[in-house]
């Protein structure tokens, strides 16, 4: 019985090391490949992205990366054969607010990429990097490496539109009859 518990624990830990996920309310700004080959996403929620959410599927389904102009990587999963599946989250207007910063960042074992944030004088984030796509390749020795496409997301270009309910919630609010 103890053997079965140990095997289950090992399989469970191995499964967790093959996937990573940022969620619909965070963005991937970096990626790390450990010497052991374990890949991790670095996730963040910049303050200018506070009230925004991306639309993410339940699991990593795309074998061909995040190719649409309104998508970025929300997570990934490697199956037992070593194939990489990406979870492509959609954000309405991404093509308007973000431009390609790096189109081919290569990361191998023992390396990492960390995007940048730019702040204004008040300390608010006005630009940040987000990983749009991850593609896995193998070198001549069969070792996996990853190519990233990185966008620079400009928060200042997002219009600050107040929701429809905002004006009505300001006190005093009186409905005047029209004569």
Curated annotation (Swiss-Prot):
InterPro entries: Dev_Signal_Hedgehog-like
GO CC annotations, alphabetized: extracellular region
Leader sequence residues: 1-19
Keywords on record: Developmental protein, Glycoprotein, Secreted, Signal
Glycosylation sites: 52, 147
The keyword Acetylation appears for this protein: no
Major location category of this protein: secreted
Domain of life per record: Eukaryota
Compartment annotation: Secreted
Tissue: Expressed in the trinucleate pharyngeal gland cell g1, seam cells and hypodermis.
Record-linked PANTHER family: PROTEIN QUA-1-RELATED
Its biological purpose: Intercellular signal essential for a variety of patterning events during development.
UniProt-recorded name of the protein: Warthog protein 3
Organism: Caenorhabditis elegans
Gene that specifies this protein: wrt-3
């Amino acid at each position: 019985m103890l053997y079965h518990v140990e095997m289950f624990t090992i399989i469970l830990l191995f499964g967790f090391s093959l996937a990573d996920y940022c969620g619909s309310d965070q963005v991937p700004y970096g990626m790390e490949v450990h010497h052991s080959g374990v890949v991790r996403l670095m996730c963040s929620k910049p303050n200018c992205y506070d009230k925004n959410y991306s639309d993410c599927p339940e699991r990593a389904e795309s074998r061909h990366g995040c190719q649409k102009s309104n998508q970025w990587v929300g997570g990934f999963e490697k199956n037992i054969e070593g194939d990489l599946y990406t979870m492509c989250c959609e954000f309405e207007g991404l093509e308007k607010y973000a431009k390609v910063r790096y189109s081919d960042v290569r990361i191998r074992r023992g390396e990492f990429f960390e995007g940048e944030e730019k702040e204004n004088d008040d300390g608010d984030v006005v630009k940040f990097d987000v990983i749009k796509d991850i593609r896995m390749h193998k070198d001549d020795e069969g070792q996996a490496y990853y190519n990233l496409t990185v966008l620079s997301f400009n928060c200042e270009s997002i219009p600050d539109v107040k929701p429809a309910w905002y004006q009505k919630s300001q006190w005093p609010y009186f409905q005047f009859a029209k004569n």
